[in-house]
UniProtKB/Swiss-Prot annotation:
Its main location: nucleus. It comes from Oryza sativa subsp. japonica. It comes from the Eukaryota. This is Transcription factor WRKY45-1. InterPro entries: WRKY_dom (IPR003657), WRKY_dom_sf (IPR036576), WRKY_plant (IPR044810). Residues 273-283 have a biased composition (Gly residues). It is found in: Nucleus. Plants overexpressing WRKY45 exhibit enhanced resistance to the rice blast fungus Magnaporthe oryzae. Plants overexpressing WRKY45 exhibit increased susceptibility to the bacterial blight Xanthomonas oryzae pv oryzae (Xoo) and the bacterial streak Xanthomonas oryzae pv oryzicola (Xoc).
Length: 326
């Protein structure tokens, strides 16, 4: 009776496993097409995980059934016709699952043989394991920007057995990240704002002639010294770091209460610190309209005397800074 019932489950088991493997491969291909959508990629990952878990559960059920009256059926399915005795029947099943995983990975990746591993991308190694019937281990890499830019690109590297100087590299997915070194430099620019009374943004009644300086991303423009009027307030900020472009000069002429504000971020300059050699131009004006040349030097001793402003917005009023010495 056992021999008459044993052939029945074998085709059903093989058909179920074949369909699930096919569905898993299709889900892996779909994952490669949805790399640009992190949310869709997470759903595909869950689908692949569900397929793998169902296949493992089906294998366990088949192994449990093999311990009873269907032992010869499990031997036929896992060994492919080569019957084995005792607990050795589980080893071919494990090999078959490993082969399924390898086929899935190869179907969604592109393999190349190279001499140099430097491909111009930023990779981080997260694992390595020994490969059966291979002399060299396989290393697993992910994109460095997996978490900050949600880039899911991966690569696998293994030294070739027949040519140790060459590497077989398998790329899975495509890079969707951007190198931070190519990002636009954040520069400061001057926003011209003249307001009377209270404002909706909570600045609280700027007087005419006030200047609101906001440090946000904007293209810098060269300063035309000849076009600047005689009455001006020049602010020079000296700080360590790369050279930034001069800030844009904005302001109107024709009104006595609208002086020009010129800000520039440059490395340390002896002329700016000394206040001579063209640092300030004396004008034929009274004490209430004189030129103010200020130089801010960045140091740890000077930090204690500095006032920090909320939201990186600083309001300079000419009536408040007249006569101050920096």
């Amino acid at each position: 009776m056992t021999s008459s019932m044993s052939p029945a489950p074998a085709p059903a088991y093989a058909q179920v496993m074949e369909d699930m493997e096919k569905g898993k491969e299709l889900a892996a291909q779909l994952q490669g097409l949805l790399r640009d959508s992190p949310e869709a990629g997470r759903f595909v990952d869950q689908i692949l995980h569900t397929f793998s878990r169902a296949m493992r559960a089906l294998d366990k059920a088949a192994v449990s059934a093999a311990g009873g009256e269907g032992s010869e059926v499990q031997s036929e399915v896992t060994c492919g016709g080569g019957a084995s005795a005792g607990g050795k029947r589980k080893a071919p099943a494990a090999d078959r699952k490993a082969n399924c995983r390898r086929r899935t990975q190869q179907s969604s990746g592109n393999s190349v043989v190279v001499k140099n591993l430097d491909d111009g991308q930023a990779w981080r190694k997260y694992g390595q394991k020994e490969i059966q019937n291979s002399k060299h281990p396989k290393a697993y890499f992910r994109c460095t920007h997996k978490y900050d830019q949600l880039c899911t690109a991966q690569r696998q590297v293994q030294r070739c057995d027949d040519d140790p100087a060459s590497y077989r590299v398998t790329y899975i997915g495509e890079h969707t990240c951007r190198d931070p070194a190519t990002a636009p430099i954040i520069a400061a620019h001057v926003i011209h704002q003249v307001a009377a009374g209270d404002n909706d943004d909570g600045c609280g009644g700027l007087q005419a002639g006030s200047r609101l300086i906001s440090f946000v991303a904007a293209p810098a423009a060269p300063v035309d010294a000849a076009a600047a009027p005689t009455t001006s307030t020049i602010t020079t900020v000296t700080a360590p770091g790369p050279l930034l472009q001069p800030l844009k000069v904005e302001g109107g002429v024709g009104s006595s209460d609208q002086e020009e504000v010129l800000s520039s971020l440059t490395p340390g300059s002896s002329a700016a610190r000394g206040g001579g050699g063209g640092g300030g131009v004396a004008g034929p004006f009274g004490p209430d309209q004189g030129d103010v040349t200020s130089s801010l030097h960045w140091s740890y001793d000077a930090v204690a005397g500095m006032e920090f402003f909320k939201n990186d917005e600083v309001v300079f009023d000419l009536d408040d800074i007249m006569g101050l010495s920096f």
